[in-house]
Design a protein with these regions (language model features):
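An amphipathic alpha-helical core segment
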Residues: 178, 182-200, 238-283
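Compact, glycine/acidic-enriched structural inserts
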Residues: 133-177, 320
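Glycine-rich, often proline-containing surface loops adjacent to acidic residues and nearby aromatics
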Residues: 75, 104-106, 137-144, 192-216, ...
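Mature, function-bearing regions of proteins
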Residues: 66, 70, 78-102, 146-152, ...
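Internal mixed beta-strand/loop scaffold within catalytic domains of large alpha/beta enzymes
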Residues: 61-140
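Long, charged, mostly alpha-helical binding arms that flank functional sites
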Residues: 165-221, 235-238
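TerminUS-proximal long segments
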Residues: 3-10, 276-320
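Gly/Pro-rich turn-and-neighbor structural signature
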Residues: 12, 16-95, 208-246, 250-260, ...
């Protein structure tokens, strides 16, 4: 996603920022309630936190977490609205003119690690960043799917839903956001994507080449991304949550979760932003699976379902 210099962005005010916050809080509540209803026997926790002015970051947030359930090994959803005096390097590397300036960042993120190896891991995030008291702003967001045992049906449904979320914003938006997702969620040291992709949008404002449009136009796309994630992933989860599995599948699931950890800690910009800005550590590490494994020179048996996963860990047109 390409944007022109930040100084050309049409400013926004507290009304627009408040509308975005209201949506992010509501999405967090809907996600938290949906996962809790799916796994009522699990260990569930909901926290609210606040950091006073004077800290490196000030603001507030909410976190919901489900662990050790019949459906979820871990499912977390987090909302935060924080302000800082100096923009961290992870957020200013593509906006050098904003380096070291005050900022405000808010959004909702969710990561789900299902118990059943046939149910895919998922991630979604929607966010708004502002600086210079609203003179500079951009939305970001997207979702991606990381199966251990992939199904073509699931991949096609996922990408159909992604395209439907993008189409009202323009004919080329899905293709651009899908390509950005394939490029972002990539492990260069492994030579593979994190999963089968989805959507990835950053720097969305009225100067963005692909989407264009004013605040309302960009905000509508972000809302469709958040709403589509919840409805589509819940359907896939219901479809696969009761598939029979054995210890072999759980073993491979732990190995693949190791790759998930590698990406989040080594490459994810959101994690780097949080670490550089002294964000809440528990919220940052919520995205990691509770159990992962690394095995020296592991090679799946040729011709096995485990070996077949490699064919899915590369960009593919799922809608042709």
């Amino acid at each position: 996603m390409n944007a022109t210099p930040a100084s050309r962005v049409t400013p926004i005010g507290e009304h627009e920022i408040g509308a975005a916050r209201e949506y992010f809080v509501g999405l967090h509540t809907r996600l938290s309630d949906a996962w809790a209803a799916l796994d009522p026997g699990s260990a569930q926790r909901r926290d609210e936190w606040q950091r006073p002015p004077g800290d490196v970051l000030s603001g507030n947030g909410r976190l919901s977490l489900i662990e050790n359930g019949a459906v979820f090994d871990r499912a977390g959803a987090a909302f935060s609205d924080v302000s800082g005096a100096r923009l961290p390097a992870a957020a200013s590397e593509r906006h050098t003119e904003l380096a070291g300036q005050p900022f405000r960042a808010m959004g909702t993120s969710v990561v789900v690690h299902p118990a059943n190896p046939y149910a895919p891991t998922s991630h979604a995030n929607v966010r708004l960043f502002t600086a210079r008291e609203g003179d500079v702003w951009w939305f970001g967001g997207g979702f991606d799917l990381t199966p251990v045992y992939p199904f073509d049906e699931d991949a096609r449904d996922w990408h159909r839903a992604a395209k439907a979320a993008c189409d009202p914003s323009g004919a080329g938006v899905y293709a651009a956001l899908k390509d950005a997702c394939d490029r972002y969620f990539y492990l260069p040291h492994r030579g593979e994507t994190r999963g089968i992709g989805g959507l990835f949008a950053d720097d969305l404002n009225d100067t963005t080449a692909v989407t264009g449009g004013d605040f309302d136009h960009c905000f509508a796309l972000i809302r469709r991304i958040g709403d589509t994630y919840l409805s589509c992933y819940r359907e896939l989860l219901e479809r696969r949550r009761n598939t029979p599995f054995a210890e072999r599948q759980r073993d491979f699931q732990r190995l693949r979760r190791g790759r998930y950890v590698e990406f989040n800690l080594a490459f994810d910009r959101g994690t780097r932003f949080g670490l550089q800005s002294s964000a809440r550590t528990e919220s940052l590490l919520m995205s990691l699976p509770p159990r992962a494994e690394w095995r020296y020179d592991y090679q799946p048996e040729p011709g096995s379902p485990e070996a077949g996963l490699a064919d899915y860990l590369k960009p593919r047109d799922w809608l042709s």
